[in-house]
């Protein structure tokens, strides 16, 4: 499967630079996303495209307010394209956009006593599952989504205590 990850950051601080650099090393981020898509049995004859933006609490709050009518920062916002006409425009299939607040990831890692890395990959996995159609509004759907998150994270060696 060919995957195009449009990865960017609008962070104005160097605080997370080392972590961001590790995402680029050996295509680590792209390989992680590919494996998640493979675990979810996503196939395509055309390249798949995914946009990922790393930001801070202030910027994600603006997006959350504008698109979800929630005036508060959040960890991740996903925009799925599979239900729109924009899904297969051009030479690839667009999965969607994922926006992650690294500040919120750091806060949650501390709150849940996880490593920053584990919390980042949890939030990223959560965002990927949303663009693949998973949701957690209904209790049954929430249970299924949590099971998939834990199974995916476990396949990478990320457990609740790591």
Curated annotation (Swiss-Prot):
Signal peptide: none
Pfam families: YbeY
Role description: Single strand-specific metallo-endoribonuclease involved in late-stage 70S ribosome quality control and in maturation of the 3' terminus of the 16S rRNA.
Database matches in SUPFAM superfamilies: Metalloproteases ('zincins'), catalytic domain (SSF55486)
Record-level GO BP terms: rRNA processing
Organism: Fusobacterium nucleatum subsp. nucleatum (strain ATCC 25586 / DSM 15643 / BCRC 10681 / CIP 101130 / JCM 8532 / KCTC 2640 / LMG 13131 / VPI 4355)
EC annotation from Swiss-Prot or TrEMBL: 3.1.-.-
Gene Ontology cellular component terms for the protein in this record: cytoplasm
Keywords from the UniProt entry: Cytoplasm, Endonuclease, Hydrolase, Metal-binding, Nuclease, Ribosome biogenesis, rRNA processing, Zinc
GO molecular function: metalloendopeptidase activity; RNA endonuclease activity; zinc ion binding
InterPro entries documented for this protein: MetalPrtase_cat_dom_sf_prd (IPR023091), YbeY (IPR002036), YbeY_CS (IPR020549)
Main localization of the protein described in the UniProt heading: cytoplasm
Cofactor or coenzyme needed: Zn(2+)
Compartments, record wording: Cytoplasm
Protein name per Swiss-Prot or TrEMBL: Endoribonuclease YbeY
Cofactor detail note: Binds 1 zinc ion.
Family statement drawn from the similarity comment of this UniProt entry: Belongs to the endoribonuclease YbeY family.
Positions annotated to bind Zn(2+): 126, 130, 136
Membrane-traversing stretches: none
């Amino acid at each position: 499967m060919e995957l195009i990850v449009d990865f960017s950051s609008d962070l104005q601080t160097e605080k997370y630079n080392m972590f961001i650099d590790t995402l680029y090393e050996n295509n680590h981020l792209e390989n992680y996303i590919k494996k998640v898509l493979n675990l979810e049995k996503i196939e395509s004859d055309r390249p798949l495209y995914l946009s990922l933006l790393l930001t801070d609490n202030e910027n994600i709050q603006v997006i959350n307010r504008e698109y979800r009518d929630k005036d508060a920062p959040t960890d991740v916002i996903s925009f799925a394209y599979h239900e729109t006409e924009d899904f297969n425009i051009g030479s690839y299939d667009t999965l969607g956009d994922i926006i992650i607040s690294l500040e919120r990831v750091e806060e949650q890692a501390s709150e849940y006593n996880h490593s920053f890395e584990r919390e980042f990959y949890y939030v990223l996995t959560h965002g990927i599952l949303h663009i693949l159609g998973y949701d957690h509004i209904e209790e049954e759907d929430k249970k299924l989504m949590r099971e998939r998150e834990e199974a995916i994270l476990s396949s990478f060696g990320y457990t609740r205590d790591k």
